């Protein structure tokens, strides 16, 4: 079985260099490795000092590089969706001839990069796929899309498909608006099932894992902690944290030693947050990581004899348990504060909102008729209590900021 390792972190922390070092190590061990960039501003070519494009290119024995172009993937794999969207907006009086597809659904095009990675994995061509993702904010938005879109497809697509078929003639004749045709709707349905498979793949702890990259400074550490919390919210496995650009103990001047003491404070904070997760410290090099020799040096220095590629720290992000008078659902939310969390229920779905991120979890059939009785956030876990619903009670229950 192949593996997928996703590297992400705040922009400028060195995630591409560290992903490249892992790819070089894996290739040297005889694993056929693909290092793929899912960033809209890729720089694999800059680091390896070679031309990289939309097709995999060799970069040494067992090592291949690929920079994905989402617009090209949409045109090649879902031409009818793209055409339908242009017809829909064009018939509404908007001139789209000079606009890229990404302007139609902002941010949505990045999803096709993940779908392409799934296709590459399913081909079995590579032993290991290392993904250099966009900065954490974009990556989190991207990783939550498969689950979010799958939920909407399951809830609303059957009705929407029927309405489009019925309304298409009227819409075109009376309002001059061209709705998606049957081919486009079939592609949307095909994409839905691809999203379901993608979600299962990315959340399979035996296949996929996420590695976070950061530097020991306040803004980066705060974002890394939030990313770790949100990744747990969406049930992704985080198997490592790489702390980059660490100053030596004696940096040679009072100014640098002062910054070194600040870094140590944030390193201790990260070690507390990522307890149980492997943490790798990386020195601040006097030169930029560029070219195969520099990547190899980083690989030898950082990875050494460690078997980092096979690290698997499986955690149960969602645990259902029977308890007195009902059931409980426990979800890992490391670093979450109760005031940042809202939980409410609609029918057989539980919605969890943490700051600006929202996740909808369909409840198992065992909890049919149950409703939220209360919830709490403590010690890095969200615990939701369910009890049997009284007859005639409203099926929509909300637990507000106080958890009641």
Language model regions located:
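Nucleotide-state-sensitive switch-loop elements of NTP-binding domains
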Residues: 1-13, 17-196
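Generic beta-strand structural signal
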Residues: 322-324, 345-346, 376-377
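Structured core elements
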Residues: 6-8, 34-35, 64-67, 129-130, ...
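Beta-rich strand-turn-strand
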Residues: 339, 368-391
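Short loop/turn motifs at secondary-structure junctions
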Residues: 1-3, 125, 237, 371, ...
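C-terminal lobe/tail of nucleotide-utilizing enzymes
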Residues: 195-338, 349-351, 356-358, 362, ...
